[in-house]
Amino acid sequence: LMVAGALRNFQNLTNWYGSSEHDMLPTDDLFYALSPEPGLEQQISSAILAPDAMADTASRTLNELRKKIHATENSIRDRLETMVRNMDTSKYLQESVVSMRNGRYVVPVKSEYRGEVSGIIHDVSSTGATVFVEPQAVVEANARILQYRAQEAQEIERILVAFTAQVAAIEPQFQYSYKAMLEIDVLLAKARLALDMKAFKPAVRTDSSFSLIRARHPLIDLSLIHISE
């Protein structure tokens, strides 16, 4: 995301410079040094939503895996919600809810009835009164979700490696552009400060003499200064 942000700044500065009217300036070479990569920037920005969030559309494979995960999770929840509402099963539960333990969907079974709900125990409450059981009916589906999650992580890693390779391929011009952008940023900051302070470039004489006319220290608030005419 930081790389995409830098590439976006290269493009914004290039657009701003190209749309402004000005004579030739000593800073022109800095703007000419910028090398925007709008295609790569757009790919990164649309794929990586946040440091820990990859868009479904980052790749066809990732999109398909997430659809499978979503469909399987819905199927599991539907089956478990039907189970917890069932009168024959609900009497063995502490409450009629579906929760997660160790990445698997479970139901809270009263410890004295742990043998009445067939499945795998994944956790026990701090009081020991509740065991969290993964019902046998959804064990296989839960296992599929874990498999899909592992494949999802592998696909995300592949996408990141591919982006890294693309950025590495433009590393020399990226570094050059980045340094130019920093220099431009410093110059713009100086220009803004000069405008805020109503400062101007002094005229330098060749005889080593100088006159300070209405001069003031730039770090002292102008409102605190009384300058006699």
Segments the model singles out, each with a brief description of its role:
Residues 4-11, 18-25, 40-228:
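Alpha-helical coupling/stalk and coiled-coil linker elements that connect catalytic or binding modules
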Residues 10, 16-17, 30-34:
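Long, low-complexity repetitive segments of secreted extracellular proteins
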Residues 32-42:
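Extended, EK/Q-rich alpha-helical coiled-coil segments that serve as long dimerization/scaffolding arms
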